[in-house]
């Protein structure tokens, strides 16, 4: 999907702005320097004092009720992302096919796929997208088509005539990945 390389970058940059403002507010509330704070999941903690912290809920409330002098009230950000260059995932694929010399029938014995989509944000979704893409490619390779007559009329206009592979026809994909973060994306996604 192309949503992470574009929208994901804008979200990451806006989140960084919110994080920076939240840190200023936490430092103000805790009466310490920003450099004395460490971030931990949902809170800023004073380094060396585990009991002195402010949660994001505390900070969000303070952002609207008692922001530090010079800071605009609120805890929100907008960022428009214009990528300096495009990012694309890539992969390598190997298909082992058996072909019956007499009939020409083919069957896929094994299919290996190695993909690199940069920083993996949500592995379950990525695996689903890879399997979906492989299945679509498999369908086209195995004869999926939309035939038209000479007048441009669609001949195969029902799913009875259109090859959509099911779990029965689809091979068991053997997938793996490597991660090479994109230098053109704030979180390395491709």
Can you describe what each PLM-predicted range is?
Residues 1-190:
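C-terminal catalytic domains of large/alpha subunits in multi-subunit enzymes
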